[in-house]
Amino acid sequence: MRVLLHLPALLASLILLQAAASTTRAQTTRTSAISDTVSQAKVQVNKAFLDSRTRLKTAMSSETPTSRQLSEYLKHAKGRTRTAIRNGQVWEESLKRLRQKASLTNVTDPSLDLTSLSLEVGCGAPAPVVRCDPCSPYRTITGDCNNRRKPALGAANRALARWLPAEYEDGLSLPFGWTPGKTRNGFPLPLAREVSNKIVGYLNEEGVLDQNRSLLFMQWGQIVDHDLDFAPDTELGSSEYSKAQCDEYCIQGDNCFPIMFPPNDPKAGTQGKCMPFFRAGFVCPTPPYKSLAREQINALTSFLDASFVYSSEPSLASRLRNLSSPLGLMAVNQEVSDHGLPYLPYDSKKPSPCEFINTTARVPCFLAGDSRASEHILLATSHTLFLREHNRLARELKRLNPQWDGEKLYQEARKILGAFVQIITFRDYLPILLGDHMQKWIPPYQGYSESVDPRISNVFTFAFRFGHLEVPSSMFRLDENYQPWGPEPELPLHTLFFNTWRMVKDGGIDPLVRGLLAKKSKLMKQNKMMTGELRNKLFQPTHRIHGFDLAAINTQRCRDHGQPGYNSWRAFCDLSQPQTLEELNTVLKSKMLAKKLLGLYGTPDNIDIWIGAIAEPLVERGRVGPLLACLLGKQFQQIRDGDRFWWENPGVFTNEQKDSLQKMSFSRLVCDNTRITKVPRDPFWANSYPYDFVDCSAIDKLDLSPWASVKN
């Protein structure tokens, strides 16, 4: 009788035990399914990465690389960036396979167990890749540990920040324009190349130069951009065939999103049906997995820290140093010099695309903190100046502090050079970029706040591409009297991509630096946006007659990144959102441009953010429109206020050191690191020689005496 009384409880316990066992079996089955699926995905993705590396090596050995192969050389992921992108691709491929299995077998969707999936892939929650020393006076190379509360905030190889949610065709990863016939807000999207042809292109180069901004103004923008963001491409497919499908046959699929040519496009006659386009690298989503939409990677630190000099990758940062010397120096070229002054070291990895630009000279690409250093000769020139300045600072600090070891000298010189980039950007560059909107978006510095998010936003990577419209069609080299230098003083822009030989074998950097100081940038004009040198001849090899279209690439990249449209960003910035032709005309102050845009897009809501932003008229005394002023200003304010090592933050430098730092200038950088003796006082403004130039003796020097150790 007593047993019967306890029978219900026993039965209930038995049921619970059976349920628990069933749950455990289901969990084990699910975990096993995830493990098997991830293993299969890893095999596929790893093969794609291996194939890509082999393919690139073979292409560079051919001595006749194509535009695509030159671009791939620049956008090829390395080191920890490569690992992060590989994990992102494995995660997305695994999730796709698991969802397919779930729908086929009608079982509970295993993708709900996203934590297990992330751990199996190797993602995990973002954590610092270095041990944080809260008392260290120096930044880490990776950007970790800047924010003590969230040590990974702003670090390299994390997702770009979203200020507005991503907008993909399928809500997850497919870009708008992917599926033929599918509309956005009721209208089909125009081809990216068609937008470039009808909105961005122009024929006549007359009257395009900016009468108030020097060529250095354009070049500084590129330097800053390469300090802040870089998203290498994904790896495509797992076979040579899939690569050929994208590269040669324009077959869309996987991470291939070719830029198709519209009917009667002049490029169609020489380049076939399309320009190949590979989608940007992305990372695993992070807990709590509120969104599974694809998030593109930023391979660099988000901080304005001169990472283009020192790298955001620890292994490369070490490789860039001269560790055989106790002076804290950066490594320099051991094979050639610029009239006794150092060049960047050559990249020892062979083969090098720069060698094939001139197969007689065969000058390799340079090795620098940013992989894009040899992309263009003026960029390589800028990198060279910063390399020399680091070594100059390190030697001078050693003279003041003989007891300092190489590590201390390296870190102190790096810290000063980082402050230099911050000061020039905020004191000299941004005020004449943002004009009257500077104070609105970047108020005076009030100190560091760990609650400010310093991460580079996804939209900023498009906003900062306004600089592509400031690039003129040719570059000039000038002699000591700022007159044309040598038999070829003017060089078409497209001949200077990967062109290291022009520097090493044909005059050094001084003639190029003088061109930066005395020649003008191109002016952003609504009817003359981007020079044909970039719109038709980007990365055009010397042995070929065609190149890429940078405007079409920028437009396609907006869609690849899932960028919301023009009006979404206007609303974000508290600006009006035009809906009609009249309203768009009011914003753009150009009925012709408004008509063209509506004819292509159907609605202002669909205008790609890069196109809409560059179409706006310039703000007073600035060089961008209101929307760009908002996006750029907001980003730079966050970069500054969310950086614990910002040069003005109390405790980073002493008051005496800060007083010295404020005397730094780009003109002094030139005086100290070239043979140039005459420079302008305001090098970002358009200057005429000799009226606006002074002797280097009239330019303030950086006084390093406040860095002298008390012990000395």
From Swiss-Prot:
Active site as annotated: 226 (proton acceptor)
GO cellular component assignments: basolateral plasma membrane; cytoplasm; extracellular exosome; extracellular region; extracellular space
Glycosylation sites: 106, 212, 322, 358
Known catalytic reactions: 2 a phenolic donor + H2O2 = 2 a phenolic radical donor + 2 H2O; thiocyanate + H2O2 + H(+) = hypothiocyanous acid + H2O; iodide + H2O2 = hypoiodite + H2O
EC number annotated for this UniProt entry: 1.11.1.7
Record PTM Phosphoserine, positions in chain: 315
Propiece residues: 27-80
Subcellular location, principal: secreted
Residues noted as binding heme b in the record, renumbered to the chain: 225, 375, 468
Keyword annotations: Antimicrobial, Calcium, Cytoplasm, Disulfide bond, Glycoprotein, Heme, Hydrogen peroxide, Iron, Metal-binding, Nitration, Oxidoreductase, Peroxidase, Phosphoprotein, Secreted, Signal
Note: Thiocyanate (SCN(-)) and hypothiocyanite (OSCN(-)) are bound in the distal heme cavity. The iodide ion (I(-)) occupies a position which is stabilized by the interactions with heme moiety, His-226, Arg-372 and Glu-375. Hydrogen peroxide is held between the heme iron and His-226.
Similarity annotation: Belongs to the peroxidase family. XPO subfamily.
Protein name: Lactoperoxidase
Organism: Homo sapiens
